[in-house]
């Protein structure tokens, strides 16, 4: 199996089309198809499922892709170090639920370790995608929460994927809403208080489920609900629609200056925020330092 074959497969997976990948790689489509078939035969697996509408990765293919990406990254590091005679790049990656404190901790990590040359990866994404990223070694670790509401299913999925979850700290849920919201003057807000207003939840794609939701109490039916895929949209909907979302309350003043506030939720629930690794995975120096930065955001009185 040649490195070039791995690069071909990564490109096909990236663009989702053998035809388009062949154009970008400046080779013929038959040559690319033959290379993929040869790799599949050598690996003893089917990497892509072909159909009239395009290609999709198989489960084995997704796992293969994770290892292939590691090989290519290591080759690039070798070339950087010994072919170009430049200092090697510092590399590190995180997949996280939509928390600003994880992003801020990442900024501090880059400031601390970012030398002249580095290749860092930070991905805010859905819960199940975080598990996939860690499992397929797209990233070094994943950040998510476990609660009483989702614990049984989450721990089952984590175990089935040969991953492990370690708690960093716990936090009480808070409601995020704009400072001009009718509920903004309350010291504590209940789910009942929130009923008249639009609820904002992050999209989880094909894994839409209360167990993979990033927001507590998402199983409670509401009349008004908006699903979004980025924090910028959430801010706009809070400001324009008196909408709200439920999160950890950690670092509450990050949103739109002073325009967004957080209020403790009355319901008795706890978010156990932690990190996910592959079984028997040892964190490198950057991983350990990133966890140190995250712990700085632990609530004083969870």
Where are these regions (language model features)?
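Short helix-boundary/capping micro-motifs
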Residues: 10-28
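A short LG(V/I)-centered, amphipathic sequence patch enriched
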Residues: 40-57
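Alpha-helical linker/hinge and terminal dimerization helices associated
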Residues: 42-43, 64-86, 101
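Central regulatory/effector-binding core of bacterial HTH transcription factors
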Residues: 89-153
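Secondary-structure junction motif
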Residues: 102-108, 151, 190-191, 195-219
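Hydrophobic hinge/microswitch elements
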Residues: 135-138, 145, 204-261
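Flexible hinge/capping segments at coil-to-helix
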Residues: 157-173, 177-199
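Beta-alpha-beta core module
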Residues: 160-166, 171, 232-281
């Amino acid at each position: 199996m040649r490195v070039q074959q791995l690069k071909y497969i990564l490109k096909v997976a990236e663009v989702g089309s053998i035809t388009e990948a062949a154009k970008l790689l400046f080779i013929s489509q038959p040559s690319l198809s033959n290379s993929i078939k040869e790799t599949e035969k050598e690996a003893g697996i089917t990497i892509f499922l072909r159909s009239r509408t395009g290609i999709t990765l198989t489960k084995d293919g997704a796992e293969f892709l994770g290892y292939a990406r590691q090989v290519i990254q290591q080759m690039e590091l070798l070339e950087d170090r010994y072919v170009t005679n430049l200092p090697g790049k510092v590399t590190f990656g995180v997949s996280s639920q939509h928390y600003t404190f994880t992003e801020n901790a990442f900024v501090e990590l880059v400031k601390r370790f970012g030398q002249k040359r580095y290749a860092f990866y930070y991905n805010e994404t859905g819960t199940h995608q975080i598990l996939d990223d860690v499992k397929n070694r797209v990233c070094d670790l994943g950040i998510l929460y476990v609660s009483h509401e989702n614990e049984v299913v989450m721990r089952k999925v984590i175990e089935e994927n040969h991953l492990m979850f370690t708690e960093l700290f716990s936090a009480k849920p808070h409601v995020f809403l704009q400072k001009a919201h009718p509920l903004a003057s309350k010291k504590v807000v209940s789910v009942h208080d929130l009923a008249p207003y639009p609820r904002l939840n992050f999209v989880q794609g094909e894994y839409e489920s209360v167990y993979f939701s990033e927001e507590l109490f998402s199983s409670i039916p509401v009349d008004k609900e908006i699903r979004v895929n980025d924090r910028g949209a959430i801010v706009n909907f809070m400001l324009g629609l008196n909408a709200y979302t439920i999160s950890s309350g950690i670092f509450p003043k990050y949103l739109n200056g002073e325009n967004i506030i957080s209020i403790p939720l009355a319901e008795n629930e706890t978010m156990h925020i932690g990190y996910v690794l592959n079984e028997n995975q040892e964190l490198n120096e950057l991983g350990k330092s990133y966890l140190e930065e995250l712990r700085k955001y632990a609530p004083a009185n969870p």
